[in-house]
C-alpha cells in the first residue's frame, strides 16, 4: 500500500523509458501504479536521435530507465539525450536507472594505452545532467566510485536465491564461483541458501581475445552435488560452458546457472542448451527475445526491485534498507 505522502506527491514523480526495453519500464510503472511518460523518439536519416516529451517536466523527480542491449552505443546515447532534454526542461532531479551498466567490463586498464570506458560512461551521464544512478549487479563494485554523485547498486541475489530455494528444496547443493574474484559474493549466496559449501573455478583469460576464457580446474568438492554456478552476466556463454564441463568432469550430479544479466550474445543459446545444464536462471534487466531463448532458460522480473528502489528514492527513504544493510 502506497503511503499518504506518496499519493500527495505522485504528480512530482515521472518515469521515462528509452526504446531499448519498454516492457521492463511498463512492468515498473505497473508496480508503482503510474504510467510511463509519453514522448516522441526517433532517428533522422543519418542516424541521429531526437527526443521530445509530451508533457511538462518542470520541477519533477525524473527517473530515466534505459537498458543497454546491442546496439549499446545507440541506447546509451538515447538515454543521454533524454537526460539532457529533462535538464533543459527544468526537472528538479534526474535519476538514470540503468539495470545493465554499459561498458562495465572496461573498468580498469589491463595494459598500457587502453581506456577506462566504464568511467567515461559515468562522466557522460553526469555531463548530460544525471544527479543519481540506479543500477543492478555491476561487474565490479569500484564502478560506483566513477560517478560524482549517489549510486544505488542494487543486487539480484535475493530474487535469484529465493527462486532456487523455492524450486530446489532439500537439494545437496554447492555454490560455485566462476573465478576466485567472486568468492566473496559466492559466500553471500551460500549463506542465503542456508549455509551451503563453496567451490570456485580457477581460470585464465587471454587479454588479446574478447570473450575468451580458459577454465582450468575446480577448487572445492562438487562430486555428487547440484552445483549452483553464479555470475553477474552471461554473454556468449563461453565462460559458463567451460565451467559446466569441468564440474561434470569432477562428478557434479547437476548444474544450475544463475546470473543477473542475460546478455546472451550468439552462440550463447546454442551453447547453454547443449551443455547439459538443468536450468539457466537470469533476470530481465535486458530484453531477451525469442531468438535468445531455449528450453532450460528461466527469466525472472527485476521490476519489483527497481520499483521499490525508485519509491525509496522518491520518498527520501533508505535504499540500503531494501537489502538489510547489504546494498
Curated annotation (Swiss-Prot):
SMART domains: Pribosyltran_N (SM01400). GO terms for biological process: 5-phosphoribose 1-diphosphate biosynthetic process; purine nucleotide biosynthetic process; ribonucleoside monophosphate biosynthetic process. The keyword Glycosyltransferase does not apply. Keywords: ATP-binding, Cytoplasm, Kinase, Magnesium, Metal-binding, Nucleotide biosynthesis, Nucleotide-binding, Transferase. It comes from the Bacteria. One of its GO terms (molecular function) is magnesium ion binding. Belongs to the ribose-phosphate pyrophosphokinase family. Class I subfamily. PANTHER family: RIBOSE-PHOSPHATE DIPHOSPHOKINASE FAMILY MEMBER, RIBOSE-PHOSPHATE PYROPHOSPHOKINASE 1, CHLOROPLASTIC. This is Ribose-phosphate pyrophosphokinase. The gene is prs.
Amino acid at each position: 500500500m502506497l503511503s499518504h505522502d506518496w499519493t500527495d506527491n505522485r504528480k512530482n514523480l515521472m518515469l521515462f523509458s528509452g526504446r531499448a526495453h519498454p516492457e521492463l519500464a511498463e512492468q515498473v510503472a505497473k508496480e508503482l501504479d503510474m504510467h510511463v511518460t509519453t514522448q516522441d523518439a526517433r532517428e533522422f536519416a543519418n542516424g541521429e536521435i531526437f527526443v521530445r516529451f509530451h508533457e511538462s517536466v518542470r520541477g519533477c523527480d525524473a527517473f530515466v530507465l534505459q537498458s543497454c542491449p546491442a546496439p549499446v552505443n545507440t541506447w546509451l546515447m538515447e538515454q543521454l539525450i533524454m537526460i539532457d532534454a529533462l535538464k533543459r526542461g527544468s526537472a528538479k532531479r534526474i535519476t538514470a536507472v540503468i539495470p545493465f551498466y554499459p561498458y562495465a567490463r572496461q573498468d580498469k586498464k589491463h595494459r598500457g594505452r587502453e581506456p577506462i570506458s566504464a568511467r567515461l560512461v559515468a562522466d557522460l551521464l553526469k555531463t548530460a545532467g544525471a544527479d543519481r544512478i540506479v543500477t543492478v549487479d555491476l561487474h565490479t563494485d569500484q564502478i560506483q566510485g566513477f560517478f560524482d554523485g549517489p549510486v544505488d547498486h542494487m543486487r539480484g541475489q535475493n530474487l535469484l536465491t529465493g527462486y532456487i530455494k523455492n524450486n530446489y528444496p532439500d537439494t545437496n547443493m554447492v555454490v560455485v564461483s566462476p573465478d576466485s574474484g567472486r568468492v566473496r559474493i559466492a559466500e553471500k549466496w551460500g549463506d542465503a541458501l542456508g549455509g551451503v559449501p563453496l567451490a570456485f573455478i580457477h581460470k585464465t583469460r587471454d587479454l588479446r581475445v574478447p570473450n575468451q576464457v580458459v577454465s582450468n580446474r575446480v577448487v572445492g568438492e562438487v562430486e555428487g552435488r547440484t552445483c549452483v554456478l553464479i555470475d553477474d552476466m552471461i554473454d556468449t556463454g563461453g565462460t559458463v560452458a567451460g565451467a559446466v564441463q569441468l564440474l561434470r568432469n569432477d562428478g557434479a550430479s547437476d548444474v544450475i546457472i544463475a546470473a543477473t544479466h542475460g546478455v546472451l550474445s550468439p552462440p550463447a543459446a546454442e551453447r547453454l542448451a547443449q551443455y547439459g545444464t538443468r536450468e539457466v536462471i537470469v533476470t530481465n534487466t535486458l530484453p531477451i527475445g525469442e531468438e535468445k531463448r531455449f528450453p532450460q532458460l528461466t527469466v525472472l522480473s527485476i521490476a519489483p526491485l527497481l520499483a521499490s528502489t525508485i519509491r525509496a528514492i522518491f520518498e527520501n527513504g533508505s535504499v540500503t534498507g531494501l537489502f538489510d544493510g547489504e546494498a
